[in-house]
Protein backbone atom coordinates (compact mmCIF):
# COMPACT_ATOMS: atom_id res chain seq x y z
CA UNK A 1 0.00 0.00 0.00
CA UNK A 2 2.85 2.34 0.81
CA UNK A 3 4.37 1.65 -2.62
CA UNK A 4 1.10 2.51 -4.39
CA UNK A 5 0.76 5.71 -2.44
CA UNK A 6 4.34 6.67 -3.19
CA UNK A 7 3.81 5.95 -6.91
CA UNK A 8 0.73 8.13 -7.06
CA UNK A 9 2.47 10.94 -5.22
CA UNK A 10 5.45 10.70 -7.56
CA UNK A 11 3.28 10.90 -10.68
CA UNK A 12 1.35 13.87 -9.36
CA UNK A 13 4.61 15.60 -8.46
CA UNK A 14 5.93 15.30 -12.00
CA UNK A 15 2.67 16.37 -13.64
CA UNK A 16 1.72 19.35 -11.47
CA UNK A 17 4.75 20.55 -9.58
CA UNK A 18 3.19 23.87 -8.65
CA UNK A 19 -0.36 22.71 -7.89
CA UNK A 20 -1.68 24.16 -4.66
CA UNK A 21 -3.11 21.68 -2.19
CA UNK A 22 -6.82 21.89 -1.40
CA UNK A 23 -7.98 23.29 1.89
CA UNK A 24 -8.00 20.56 4.51
CA UNK A 25 -10.72 20.10 7.10
CA UNK A 26 -8.57 19.61 10.20
CA UNK A 27 -9.75 18.60 13.65
CA UNK A 28 -7.74 19.07 16.87
CA UNK A 29 -6.13 15.99 18.31
CA UNK A 30 -7.71 14.42 21.39
CA UNK A 31 -5.74 13.93 24.56
CA UNK A 32 -3.80 10.73 24.83
CA UNK A 33 -5.56 7.91 26.73
CA UNK A 34 -3.13 5.54 28.39
CA UNK A 35 -3.95 1.81 28.08
CA UNK A 36 -0.95 0.30 29.82
CA UNK A 37 -2.50 0.11 33.29
CA UNK A 38 -5.98 0.71 34.74
CA UNK A 39 -4.55 3.24 37.20
CA UNK A 40 -3.25 5.51 34.43
CA UNK A 41 -5.16 8.76 33.98
CA UNK A 42 -5.44 11.30 31.17
CA UNK A 43 -2.17 12.88 30.15
CA UNK A 44 -2.08 16.10 28.12
CA UNK A 45 -0.58 16.24 24.66
CA UNK A 46 2.94 17.70 24.44
CA UNK A 47 1.88 19.98 21.55
CA UNK A 48 0.41 23.44 21.87
CA UNK A 49 -3.15 24.14 20.57
CA UNK A 50 -1.76 26.14 17.64
CA UNK A 51 0.44 23.27 16.50
CA UNK A 52 -2.44 20.82 16.80
CA UNK A 53 -4.51 22.77 14.27
CA UNK A 54 -1.61 23.03 11.81
CA UNK A 55 -1.03 19.28 11.48
CA UNK A 56 -2.44 17.68 8.25
CA UNK A 57 -4.13 14.72 9.93
CA UNK A 58 -7.77 15.16 8.87
CA UNK A 59 -10.03 12.27 7.87
CA UNK A 60 -10.51 13.60 4.30
CA UNK A 61 -6.86 13.89 3.22
CA UNK A 62 -6.47 13.17 -0.49
CA UNK A 63 -3.13 11.57 -1.30
CA UNK A 64 -3.72 11.84 -5.04
CA UNK A 65 -2.17 15.28 -5.07
CA UNK A 66 0.96 16.51 -3.51
CA UNK A 67 0.74 18.63 -0.39
CA UNK A 68 3.00 20.60 1.86
CA UNK A 69 2.87 21.47 5.52
CA UNK A 70 1.80 25.02 6.39
CA UNK A 71 4.88 27.01 7.25
CA UNK A 72 7.25 24.37 5.81
CA UNK A 73 9.88 25.36 3.27
CA UNK A 74 9.86 22.07 1.30
CA UNK A 75 7.27 19.59 0.14
CA UNK A 76 6.84 16.17 1.67
CA UNK A 77 7.44 13.32 -0.74
CA UNK A 78 7.35 9.56 -0.48
CA UNK A 79 11.12 9.46 -0.18
CA UNK A 80 10.89 11.67 2.88
CA UNK A 81 8.30 9.35 4.40
CA UNK A 82 10.44 6.31 3.69
CA UNK A 83 13.54 8.00 5.01
CA UNK A 84 11.85 8.79 8.35
CA UNK A 85 13.11 6.12 10.69
CA UNK A 86 12.05 5.69 14.34
CA UNK A 87 15.33 7.25 15.44
CA UNK A 88 15.57 10.03 12.84
CA UNK A 89 13.73 13.34 13.39
CA UNK A 90 10.79 13.93 11.08
CA UNK A 91 7.41 15.69 10.88
CA UNK A 92 5.86 13.06 13.15
CA UNK A 93 8.46 13.53 15.84
CA UNK A 94 6.48 16.46 17.22
CA UNK A 95 3.83 14.03 18.43
CA UNK A 96 6.33 12.16 20.59
CA UNK A 97 7.84 12.99 23.93
CA UNK A 98 11.30 14.56 23.56
CA UNK A 99 12.91 11.63 25.40
CA UNK A 100 11.03 8.95 23.41
CA UNK A 101 12.81 7.01 20.69
CA UNK A 102 9.81 5.08 19.35
CA UNK A 103 6.20 5.90 18.49
CA UNK A 104 4.74 3.23 20.77
CA UNK A 105 7.06 3.69 23.67
CA UNK A 106 5.53 4.52 27.02
CA UNK A 107 4.85 8.17 27.70
CA UNK A 108 6.79 8.01 30.96
CA UNK A 109 10.37 6.96 31.25
CA UNK A 110 12.54 6.60 34.32
CA UNK A 111 14.40 9.84 34.87
CA UNK A 112 17.25 8.07 36.63
CA UNK A 113 18.05 4.51 35.54
CA UNK A 114 18.42 2.29 38.56
CA UNK A 115 21.73 0.73 39.45
CA UNK A 116 21.86 -2.94 40.26
CA UNK A 117 24.52 -2.59 42.92
CA UNK A 118 23.03 0.43 44.68
CA UNK A 119 21.18 0.46 47.97
CA UNK A 120 17.44 0.94 48.29
CA UNK A 121 17.94 4.66 48.70
CA UNK A 122 20.55 7.00 47.33
CA UNK A 123 21.39 10.56 48.35
CA UNK A 124 22.50 13.02 45.67
CA UNK A 125 24.18 16.27 46.69
CA UNK A 126 22.38 18.29 44.04
CA UNK A 127 18.85 17.10 44.80
CA UNK A 128 16.50 17.75 47.67
CA UNK A 129 14.91 14.31 47.89
CA UNK A 130 16.01 10.70 48.01
CA UNK A 131 15.95 9.04 44.56
CA UNK A 132 14.62 5.50 44.65
CA UNK A 133 16.19 3.05 42.17
CA UNK A 134 13.81 1.29 39.81
CA UNK A 135 15.00 -2.17 40.69
CA UNK A 136 12.68 -2.06 43.68
CA UNK A 137 9.15 -2.10 42.34
CA UNK A 138 7.37 -1.77 45.68
CA UNK A 139 6.72 1.96 45.36
CA UNK A 140 6.26 2.24 41.57
CA UNK A 141 3.52 0.90 39.38
CA UNK A 142 4.52 -1.64 36.69
CA UNK A 143 3.11 0.48 33.86
CA UNK A 144 4.73 3.74 34.93
CA UNK A 145 8.00 3.15 36.76
CA UNK A 146 8.85 6.85 36.93
CA UNK A 147 5.45 8.22 37.93
CA UNK A 148 6.26 8.31 41.63
CA UNK A 149 9.58 10.06 41.10
CA UNK A 150 7.97 12.65 38.85
CA UNK A 151 5.56 13.47 41.66
CA UNK A 152 8.26 13.54 44.33
CA UNK A 153 10.64 15.71 42.36
CA UNK A 154 8.90 18.96 43.26
CA UNK A 155 8.96 18.51 47.01
CA UNK A 156 11.59 19.93 49.29
CA UNK A 157 12.51 17.37 51.92
CA UNK A 158 13.84 18.04 55.40
CA UNK A 159 16.97 15.92 55.71
CA UNK A 160 17.11 16.29 59.48
CA UNK A 161 13.77 14.54 59.77
CA UNK A 162 14.92 11.70 57.52
CA UNK A 163 17.96 11.06 59.76
CA UNK A 164 19.93 8.92 57.24
CA UNK A 165 22.98 6.88 58.30
CA UNK A 166 26.47 8.26 57.60
CA UNK A 167 27.02 8.67 53.85
CA UNK A 168 29.97 10.07 51.94
CA UNK A 169 27.72 12.66 50.28
CA UNK A 170 25.65 13.43 53.35
CA UNK A 171 27.97 16.05 54.85
CA UNK A 172 25.72 18.79 53.53
CA UNK A 173 22.88 17.45 55.68
CA UNK A 174 24.59 18.47 58.92
CA UNK A 175 23.43 21.82 60.34
CA UNK A 176 25.71 24.81 60.39
CA UNK A 177 27.84 25.71 63.38
CA UNK A 178 25.79 27.26 66.14
CA UNK A 179 22.58 25.55 65.04
CA UNK A 180 20.63 23.12 67.13
CA UNK A 181 21.30 19.49 66.25
CA UNK A 182 18.78 16.75 66.72
CA UNK A 183 21.30 14.49 68.43
CA UNK A 184 22.22 17.13 70.99
CA UNK A 185 20.76 17.28 74.50
CA UNK A 186 17.18 18.58 74.39
CA UNK A 187 15.80 21.27 76.60
CA UNK A 188 14.23 18.63 78.84
CA UNK A 189 17.67 17.37 79.88
CA UNK A 190 18.65 20.86 80.99
CA UNK A 191 15.44 21.10 82.96
CA UNK A 192 16.25 17.79 84.65
CA UNK A 193 19.72 19.04 85.52
CA UNK A 194 18.25 22.16 87.06
CA UNK A 195 15.73 20.11 88.99
CA UNK A 196 18.43 17.77 90.36
CA UNK A 197 19.44 20.05 93.29
CA UNK A 198 15.79 20.43 94.20
CA UNK A 199 15.33 16.66 94.28
CA UNK A 200 18.44 16.37 96.46
CA UNK A 201 16.95 18.87 98.86
CA UNK A 202 13.75 16.88 98.93
CA UNK A 203 15.66 13.68 99.65
CA UNK A 204 17.45 15.37 102.53
CA UNK A 205 14.12 16.50 103.95
CA UNK A 206 12.79 12.96 103.64
CA UNK A 207 15.83 11.63 105.45
CA UNK A 208 14.95 13.94 108.31
CA UNK A 209 11.76 11.96 108.84
CA UNK A 210 13.85 8.88 109.69
CA UNK A 211 15.87 10.66 112.37
CA UNK A 212 15.57 9.77 116.04
CA UNK A 213 12.56 11.15 117.80
CA UNK A 214 14.54 13.46 120.04
CA UNK A 215 16.40 15.20 117.18
CA UNK A 216 13.41 16.00 114.99
CA UNK A 217 12.61 19.29 116.70
CA UNK A 218 16.23 20.48 116.88
CA UNK A 219 15.56 22.70 113.85
CA UNK A 220 13.28 25.66 114.59
CA UNK A 221 9.78 25.50 113.20
CA UNK A 222 9.44 27.16 109.80
CA UNK A 223 6.98 29.94 109.05
CA UNK A 224 4.86 27.64 106.86
CA UNK A 225 3.93 25.36 109.77
CA UNK A 226 0.91 26.16 111.88
CA UNK A 227 1.39 27.44 115.42
CA UNK A 228 -0.75 26.22 118.26
CA UNK A 229 -3.24 28.88 119.41
CA UNK A 230 -4.24 27.31 122.70
CA UNK A 231 -4.40 29.59 125.80
CA UNK A 232 -1.13 28.27 127.22
CA UNK A 233 0.75 28.86 123.95
CA UNK A 234 -0.70 32.35 123.61
CA UNK A 235 0.33 33.17 127.17
CA UNK A 236 3.82 31.80 126.60
CA UNK A 237 4.12 33.83 123.41
CA UNK A 238 3.03 36.96 125.25
CA UNK A 239 5.54 36.40 128.05
CA UNK A 240 8.32 35.25 125.71
CA UNK A 241 8.93 32.01 127.61
CA UNK A 242 9.84 29.25 125.11
CA UNK A 243 9.66 26.34 127.54
CA UNK A 244 6.54 27.25 129.43
CA UNK A 245 4.65 29.98 131.20
CA UNK A 246 7.00 29.87 134.18
CA UNK A 247 10.16 29.89 132.00
CA UNK A 248 11.49 26.68 133.53
CA UNK A 249 12.11 23.24 132.13
CA UNK A 250 8.61 22.08 132.85
CA UNK A 251 6.98 20.27 129.98
CA UNK A 252 4.76 22.60 128.00
CA UNK A 253 1.09 21.58 127.90
CA UNK A 254 -1.53 22.51 125.33
CA UNK A 255 -4.89 23.03 127.00
CA UNK A 256 -8.38 23.18 125.57
CA UNK A 257 -9.90 26.64 125.20
CA UNK A 258 -13.50 25.42 125.54
CA UNK A 259 -14.98 26.89 128.75
CA UNK A 260 -15.57 24.24 131.36
CA UNK A 261 -13.23 21.64 129.81
CA UNK A 262 -9.66 22.49 130.87
CA UNK A 263 -8.05 19.32 129.47
CA UNK A 264 -4.37 19.59 128.61
CA UNK A 265 -2.23 17.50 126.25
CA UNK A 266 1.49 17.22 125.66
CA UNK A 267 1.14 17.09 121.85
CA UNK A 268 -0.72 19.45 119.57
CA UNK A 269 -2.06 16.51 117.55
CA UNK A 270 -3.81 15.19 120.65
CA UNK A 271 -5.29 18.63 121.30
CA UNK A 272 -6.56 18.83 117.72
CA UNK A 273 -8.18 15.43 118.06
CA UNK A 274 -9.81 16.60 121.28
CA UNK A 275 -11.11 19.74 119.56
CA UNK A 276 -12.60 17.55 116.80
CA UNK A 277 -14.44 15.69 119.51
CA UNK A 278 -15.92 19.03 120.65
CA UNK A 279 -16.91 20.06 117.14
CA UNK A 280 -18.18 16.62 116.14
CA UNK A 281 -15.90 16.39 113.11
CA UNK A 282 -15.05 12.81 112.12
CA UNK A 283 -12.73 12.88 109.11
CA UNK A 284 -11.51 9.25 109.34
CA UNK A 285 -13.89 6.93 107.47
CA UNK A 286 -13.80 3.13 107.37
CA UNK A 287 -13.59 1.95 103.76
CA UNK A 288 -14.64 -1.61 104.56
CA UNK A 289 -17.49 -2.94 102.45
CA UNK A 290 -20.93 -1.86 103.77
CA UNK A 291 -19.37 -0.22 106.85
CA UNK A 292 -18.66 3.49 106.35
CA UNK A 293 -18.19 4.34 110.05
CA UNK A 294 -16.47 7.63 110.84
CA UNK A 295 -14.02 8.34 113.63
CA UNK A 296 -12.40 11.38 115.22
CA UNK A 297 -8.91 9.91 115.54
CA UNK A 298 -6.86 7.73 113.23
CA UNK A 299 -5.96 5.24 115.96
CA UNK A 300 -9.65 4.66 116.56
CA UNK A 301 -10.06 3.83 112.88
CA UNK A 302 -7.13 1.40 113.02
CA UNK A 303 -8.62 -0.31 116.04
CA UNK A 304 -11.96 -0.54 114.23
CA UNK A 305 -10.30 -2.09 111.17
CA UNK A 306 -8.85 -4.79 113.39
CA UNK A 307 -12.39 -5.79 114.31
CA UNK A 308 -12.98 -6.48 110.61
CA UNK A 309 -9.76 -8.42 110.13
CA UNK A 310 -9.75 -10.10 113.54
CA UNK A 311 -6.03 -9.58 114.13
CA UNK A 312 -4.87 -9.35 117.75
CA UNK A 313 -1.11 -9.24 118.18
CA UNK A 314 -0.62 -8.23 121.83
CA UNK A 315 -1.12 -11.30 124.06
CA UNK A 316 -0.92 -11.22 127.83
CA UNK A 317 1.91 -13.30 129.36
CA UNK A 318 -0.07 -14.02 132.54
CA UNK A 319 -3.46 -14.96 131.16
CA UNK A 320 -4.73 -16.01 127.75
CA UNK A 321 -6.19 -12.65 126.74
CA UNK A 322 -5.03 -10.95 123.51
CA UNK A 323 -5.30 -7.22 122.78
CA UNK A 324 -5.22 -5.13 119.64
CA UNK A 325 -3.21 -2.27 121.10
CA UNK A 326 -0.11 -2.21 123.27
CA UNK A 327 -1.49 0.43 125.63
CA UNK A 328 -4.47 -1.77 126.27
CA UNK A 329 -2.12 -4.61 127.15
CA UNK A 330 -0.15 -2.33 129.48
CA UNK A 331 -3.34 -1.29 131.21
CA UNK A 332 -4.32 -4.93 131.52
CA UNK A 333 -0.95 -5.80 133.06
CA UNK A 334 -1.60 -3.26 135.78
CA UNK A 335 -4.59 -5.31 136.82
CA UNK A 336 -2.32 -8.30 137.27
CA UNK A 337 0.12 -6.21 139.28
CA UNK A 338 -2.71 -4.89 141.43
CA UNK A 339 -3.92 -8.42 142.01
CA UNK A 340 -0.44 -9.42 143.15
CA UNK A 341 -0.29 -6.48 145.54
CA UNK A 342 -3.69 -7.39 146.94
CA UNK A 343 -2.59 -10.98 147.32
CA UNK A 344 0.60 -9.90 149.07
CA UNK A 345 -1.36 -7.57 151.34
CA UNK A 346 -3.82 -10.34 152.15
CA UNK A 347 -0.98 -12.71 152.97
CA UNK A 348 0.66 -10.17 155.26
CA UNK A 349 -2.69 -9.54 156.93
CA UNK A 350 -3.21 -13.22 157.62
CA UNK A 351 0.25 -13.43 159.17
CA UNK A 352 -0.50 -10.57 161.49
CA UNK A 353 -3.84 -12.09 162.42
CA UNK A 354 -2.23 -15.46 163.30
CA UNK A 355 0.31 -13.89 165.73
CA UNK A 356 -2.27 -11.72 167.59
CA UNK A 357 -3.57 -12.49 171.16
CA UNK A 358 -7.08 -13.90 171.35
CA UNK A 359 -9.60 -12.00 173.37
CA UNK A 360 -10.07 -13.29 176.97
CA UNK A 361 -12.85 -15.71 177.61
CA UNK A 362 -13.20 -16.70 174.09
CA UNK A 363 -11.58 -20.08 174.32
CA UNK A 364 -13.23 -20.88 177.62
CA UNK A 365 -16.58 -20.00 176.19
CA UNK A 366 -16.12 -22.50 173.39
CA UNK A 367 -14.97 -25.10 175.81
CA UNK A 368 -17.92 -24.40 178.04
CA UNK A 369 -20.22 -24.71 175.13
CA UNK A 370 -18.56 -27.91 174.08
CA UNK A 371 -18.50 -29.32 177.59
CA UNK A 372 -22.13 -28.83 178.28
CA UNK A 373 -23.77 -32.23 178.60
CA UNK A 374 -27.12 -32.86 177.03
CA UNK A 375 -30.00 -32.96 179.44
CA UNK A 376 -32.29 -35.81 179.74
UniProtKB/Swiss-Prot annotation:
The keyword Isomerase does not apply. Residues 173-186 have a biased composition (Low complexity). GO terms for cellular component: chromatin; cytosol; nucleus. One of its GO terms (molecular function) is zinc ion binding. InterPro entries: Znf_C2H2_sf, Znf_C2H2_type. Its main location: nucleus. A zinc finger (C2H2-type) spans 254-278, 284-308, 314-336. Ubiquitous. Gene3D superfamilies: Classic Zinc Finger. Residues 1-70, 167-223, 333-376 are annotated as: Disordered. CDD domains: SP6_N. A motif (9aaTAD) lies at residues 118-126. Keywords: Amelogenesis imperfecta, Disease variant, DNA-binding, Metal-binding, Nucleus, Repeat, Transcription, Transcription regulation, Zinc, Zinc-finger. Pfam families: zf-C2H2. Promotes cell proliferation. Plays a role in tooth germ growth. Plays a role in the control of enamel mineralization. Binds the AMBN promoter. Belongs to the Sp1 C2H2-type zinc-finger protein family. It is linked to Amelogenesis imperfecta 1K: A form of amelogenesis imperfecta, a disorder characterized by defective enamel formation. The enamel may be hypoplastic, hypomineralized or both, and affected teeth may be discoloured, sensitive or prone to disintegration. AI1K is an autosomal dominant form characterized by hypoplastic enamel in all teeth. The 9aaTAD motif is a transactivation domain present in a large number of yeast and animal transcription factors. This is Transcription factor Sp6. It comes from Homo sapiens.
